Regions:
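RecB-family 4Fe-4S metal-dependent nuclease core
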Residues: 1-357
């Protein structure tokens, strides 16, 4: 069969084989997922697992059902965890010794890891000083760190997550999630169940939107700087540490973050005009839109969970506005043997993106 398939050579034994096995589709391969009962009686999604499902249901199946052994913990995973832990401790009590907190968690042995550890440690120290300066501009009187939440939507459907930091002033709240990567929160993808990290925090808190000041990401490790003769490194660092996300359009709430006068020193894409109005380029959101966001998150949780309980793990990577948003960084892209017919195509009209992780 191999000689026939590769070189077109006909062997006399083929006729007797065909009479026994008939002419099958030798060399053909069906990559499609064959639905079967994976015995999943309940689903507990997080933002990341829901993101995985909406990127590609088969990816979720591999990550969360089969769970191939992948015990490798990268340097940047570890350094990210250390940064989160140290910032949590320092935000709660800034009299603690930064060096002791950091060094007690470090287990790096190679010269390369030790070098980058020192560099990142100093950058996180700078980050903390900027966070303190931002706090001095605000009227927050309380903070809660690493808040873990698990919600029950149905008897067999749950949603969980944790929020790095919740800043409080009386009944008003501000949500902050630290990031050490380079993510962009693209709200044009929300309707497809993607990039719902910030809206997920709103959903987890289950608070009235009228209490929300804003919900944001905050970069901890700076990207590569593009030279700008008008800005020194310190200025660029302060700009990179601005909160990125969505701010209430209620100026009275915004003024809890800082006494806003012109361009915000704390939040990116936020400014007030000389007339006292929010600038047209400000990234703000109304309470009703927050309610819609919360409703969308719940709908997407239920939609994904129902499909998972129905054993739907099709290979269905998404292409949005001609951009493949599922396969670029997928570690399974070489084993799913996806075909053109497997892609799911969407188009959006929005062009807005919010810088994040």
């Amino acid at each position: 069969m191999d000689n026939l398939d590769k070189y077109g050579e006909h062997n006399d034994d083929l006729d007797s084989m065909y009479s026994t096995y008939d002419r099958n589709n030798y060399g053909d391969y069906d990559n499609s997922y064959k639905r079967f009962d994976v015995n999943k009686k309940e689903v507990c999604l997080s933002y990341s697992s829901m993101q995985s499902y909406y990127e590609c249901a088969f990816k979720y199946y591999l990550d969360n059902i089969l769970r191939p052994d992948d015990s490798d913990v990268t340097f940047f995973n570890t350094i990210g965890t250390i940064a989160h832990n140290v910032l949590q401790e320092m935000v709660l009590d800034n009299t603690k010794d930064f060096d002791v907190l950091w060094d007690n968690q470090v287990t790096f042995t190679s010269a390369k890891e030790s070098y980058f550890n020192k560099k990142i440690k100093e950058e996180i120290r700078e980050d903390f000083n900027i966070i303190l300066n931002q706090k001095e501009l605000s009227y927050f009187d309380d903070v809660e760190c690493e808040k873990r939440i698990k919600l029950k939507l149905r008897d067999n459907i749950f949603f969980k997550g944790f929020i790095d930091k919740i800043l409080k002033c009386k009944d008003n709240l501000c949500i902050v999630d630290y990031k050490t990567g380079n993510t962009k929160i693209e709200d044009k993808y929300f309707e497809f169940g993607l990039n719902l990290q910030l809206p997920s925090y709103l959903y987890l808190l289950q608070e009235d939107p009228s209490k929300i000041i804003g919900f944001y990401l905050q970069h901890l490790v700076a990207p590569k700087y593009v030279y700008d003769e008008k800005k020194d490194i310190e200025t660029q660092k302060n700009e990179d540490m601005k909160l990125s996300g969505f701010t209430s359009n209620d100026i009275s709430r915004i003024n809890i973050l800082e006494d806003l006068d012109g361009k915000s020193s704390v939040v990116s894409k936020l400014a007030i005009t000389k007339n006292g109005d929010l600038s047209k380029n400000s990234k703000v959101i109304a309470d009703e839109d927050m309610k819609d966001m919360i409703k969308l998150v719940e709908d997407k949780i239920l939609e994904a969970s129902t499909s998972i309980l129905n054993n739907d793990f099709s290979i269905n990577p998404k292409v949005i506005d001609n951009k493949n948003v599922s396969c670029i960084y997928c570690r399974y892209k070489d084993i799913c043997y996806k075909r053109l017919k497997d892609y799911v195509y969407y188009e959006t009209k929005k062009e807005e993106a919010v810088d994040g992780d």
